Amino acid sequence: MVLNYIWVAFFMIAFVIAIIKLIFMGDVEVFPAIMNSTFDSSKTAFEISLGLTGVLSLWLGIMKIGEKGGVVNAMARVLSPVFNKLFPELPKGHPVYGNIFMNIAANMLGLDNAATPLGLKAMEGLQELNPKKDTASNAMIMFLVLNTSGLTLIPVSIMVYRAQMGAAQPTDIFIPILIATFVSTLAGIIVTSLFQRINLLQPVLLATLGGMSAAVAAIIWGFSRLDSTMMNLVGTTTANVLLLTIIISFILAGVRKRINVYDAFVEGAKEGFSTAVRIIPYLVAVLVGIGVFRASGAMDWLINGVTWLVSLTGCNADWVGALPTALMKPLSGSGARGMMVDAMNTYGADSFVGRLSCIFQGSTDTTFYILAVYFGSVGIAKTRHAVACGLLSDLAGIIAAIAICYLFFG
């Protein structure tokens, strides 16, 4: 519903500004520019979707091997001690833990198609344990914040889009996204724990979160000591080594499980074409709306206005061009994806803005959409502190993304 209002606003604002330019500024080119943008944006959306098919099939095939090879189950077992502490009101050993673990693990591996059904199943289990059926329980809120923080180990779709948009090294945003999404998740856990009075100083939580924080701090410290050329080289090399290691690990997991690895890959790869075709209408709608908004000059006015405000503080304003992606992400995944593609198309995939928009896309998730779907599926009307915790997690991810992008690419 929110995306509907935003999409209509793109056209209405563009039309009003175009009228003002035509009548008061004598700009006779603005309406032809807007109409040309609709054709160009439609063509761009289709070409992007068509180009996605091959790479998307590759990664969906790899993911299917990991799924059938038991990687998701293995990650669930590793996460078990931590989640027992984050969900103290749930009985130990309750079946709902299985769906919670599977959902989080599937999200971390980028298995969106598997994650959503598992998440809805987990919500049903949590609702059974919920004493107030119209009010979100603490466990529900913690579960949703972990989802909205967008913790992902393999940002497949973003790397695919970067490859399609002509990035020299599509994987160069891999480590920055890992760091930003970790910060977002950590912030979400801390804020939600404060609301729910969960003691984060428990040995298991302290060791896990502290260890991960120390690792991220070490990565940031190490990269901060490198010059920009060496940082890009080390970051890209490390990212590609990690990604290939993950692929090999998935294949070995499949071999160990004695599944037909080739057939599993083909089964997953078949989904690549249908997925690419399925996103065409969404991408056309969003890119045309953004194209009209940009061609009218409204986007320039917005960005220049924010840039001016930021410049008054004396801060660098290079990041402002990627701001539309950050603002759209909590509202709509497809809308933010369109903003990201538009930023790469306008500024270049390897530009600072292009890279930052990708990090924004990967650092958080669609908070309002997730809250609506998950709470709606079990009839929750009173969400308590879920929205506040989700948005604070998003804000932390956005701030971290900006800082990390300056560190790696500034």
Predicted regions span which residues?
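Hydrophobic alpha-helical context, especially transmembrane and signal-peptide helices
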Residues: 5, 33, 45, 94, ...
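C-terminal transmembrane helix pair
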Residues: 114-115, 122-162, 167-197, 323-410
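Hydrophobic alpha-helical segments, principally membrane-spanning helices and signal/leader peptides
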Residues: 36-39, 46, 95-97, 132-140, ...
